[in-house]
């Protein structure tokens, strides 16, 4: 598994909460295990204490994404470095479970399970993956969805660094909202214009008044 894959751990954890909507799915041991994904042995070690630990880490990781989205690269890096120091990783070379066409192991870097607890292991993995993406792709690849009130975190892997939303659904919703806002503004401007026009003359009220004054003179 490539290190870049582990960055999704950070995204999944941050997006387990939607503060603006009052939604939090990280409320049980089962929710913690689901974060790890299928087939992860570390998930079996999860306990009630890991719920609280991961919710604390979640807030710190969200701060990394928000700093990056605000263009504050130094703050984003400092926040992530603090997490990396607190939750160090144990890298190992792995490959026995993956073979090439000749049956030889496909060696790759793997992050070993953390000895302390399930949440520490998850955090170390998430932070290492995020750090890899940040250094390889750039801090500006970390973003927060612009579709109000979503604010989900995402990693921009587009070729032109143009991503603004966490999903196609949010992009569509934002585009529809922008279209309706433009349409509403156009209607309001048209209505105001009609109000100041003098019926039957095509002149605005100010122009009609000036024309009348000139005629009296």
Feature locations, PLM:
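Short metal-binding segments enriched for Cys and/or His
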Residues: 173-184
């Amino acid at each position: 598994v490539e290190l870049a894959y582990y960055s999704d751990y950070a995204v999944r954890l941050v997006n387990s909460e939607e503060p603006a909507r009052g939604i939090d799915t990280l409320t049980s041991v089962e929710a913690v295990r689901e974060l790890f994904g299928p087939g992860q042995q570390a998930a079996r070690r999860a306990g009630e204490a890991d719920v609280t630990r991961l919710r604390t880490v979640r807030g710190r990781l969200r701060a990394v994404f928000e700093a990056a989205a605000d263009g504050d690269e130094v703050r984003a890096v400092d926040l992530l470095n603090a997490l990396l120091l607190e939750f160090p990783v144990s890298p190992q070379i792995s490959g026995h479970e993956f073979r090439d066409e000749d049956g030889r192991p496909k060696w790759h870097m793997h992050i070993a399970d953390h000895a302390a607890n399930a949440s520490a292991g998850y955090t170390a993995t998430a932070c290492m993956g995020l750090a890899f993406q940040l250094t390889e792709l750039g801090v500006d690849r970390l973003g927060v969805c612009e579709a109000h009130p979503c604010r989900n975190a995402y990693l921009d892997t587009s070729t032109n660094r143009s991503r603004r939303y966490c999903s196609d659904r949010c992009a569509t919703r934002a585009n529809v909202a922008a279209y309706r806002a433009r349409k509403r503004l156009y209607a309001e401007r048209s209505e105001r214009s009609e109000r100041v026009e003098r019926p039957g003359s095509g002149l605005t009220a100010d122009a009609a008044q000036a024309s009348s004054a000139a005629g009296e003179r």
